[in-house]
Amino acid sequence: MASKISKAKSNREAIWPGGVPKPAMPYSPAIKAGPWVFIAGQLASDFGPDGLAMECRDHPDLPFQSIPQRRQSAYILQNIKDTCAAAGASLDDDSVRIWQWFTAPNQNRDGGTWVGDGFTITPYLEERDRFLTHDRPASTGMGIKNLLVKDTIVEVDVLLNTETKKQQVALDVPQALAGYSQGLITGDWVFTAGEHATDFVGDTGRADYNGPRSAIQLDARTPSELLWYGLPVKLQTQKLFDKLERNLETCGSSMKDVVHATIYYSHPKNLAEIEEAWIERFPVDPPARTMIPYMGIGIRGCDPEIALVALKKGGKTKKQTIMADGVGAPIGHEPHAVKAGDLLFFSTQIAGDTNGLCAGGKRAEEYPWYGLPARAQMNFILENVAKVCEAAGTSIENICRRQAFHTDFDWFMESIDEWARHFPKDPPCSTTLEIGGPLHLDGALFLLDLIGYCPDE
């Protein structure tokens, strides 16, 4: 039976800061909803005719005088800082979660996650450290295929909480090298950074090693590739959950208190191994979950990366699993969504269910130029989203943030046009990325990661 919660009046508003480039597509630069501020993906464009912002361009006769990633990162982070201020928030003091997306043209997209030898994000990190000086937000940084504006190579989006002070938690696990918070608490909320099955040493300095050189911790490795044994992605996922469980306990939470997991992984052909480890850890009443393939991970050999949102034990904020009438069964062991306090976390939104792809979501072979499949897929998803929102006591107008992962940007314009039809006023903030394909649902052109707002009754 579907759960249903009564509706309450919303205090969600779009933020349009002065002095920051206005998006060229139908989304808001930021959404403020109660204590939460969602910042749309920012990239180094002023959305003018030249695409890349003038501040990020070298003189055409001096193309080697600066590091493009540094210039673009500084431009992006300043715009984010200004957008936060327009929403009454501080990027440094209030940010609790940050996502960073880097174009990685040499990334292995055929079952691995390595972004290619020589790839670095150090210029970005050095710029980030000028803007984020303490209790840095829990972080994810991923290699992706492409961004929407030519020559842009970095995109960043952020979540902030203006109500309660954030605090970085010292965790008894191998320490990340990039200087972010692996565990962060704010009020009743716990955010973990994207974690991996690594000790941040791996084969560095080792004369003997098992299999290809990697940064995977030794107990998360399967036997030598010369033997017929082992499920390498499943084993990494199991060891990763062990680490996350310890992290949550240190933060005053537990795996039972997880409300949403984001799983960044290599390729849909490895999904089944992750799913087996997931079911072992969450046999009943699992949290909401978004699974995103073709991710470039900056720790060689690691697959997957998992980040969690959880609640502190014994806090006032409670969670509730949402299953909506009229919405097909999720693909995999996950609910439609989980409501936690005033936020609604959706599981992977994709244009189908256990019965396959939605009607109209693929052109017939006999009529290869007939139909608008991206429009049909987006409409299918958003009709489901509206039903899930209704079951949670809110409405689709209270969606605050989307991350959209496209197989091919050729379908972007058709899909965003349909998206805009469902949000005629104050559309959610948005981050849109090209990752490649195919996805785990044959014929699907994109997947969405959504967060909604459920105002207090």
Which residues does each predicted region cover?
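N-terminal presequence-like segments and the immediate start of the first folded domain
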Residues: 1-97, 102-242, 246-260, 265-383, ...
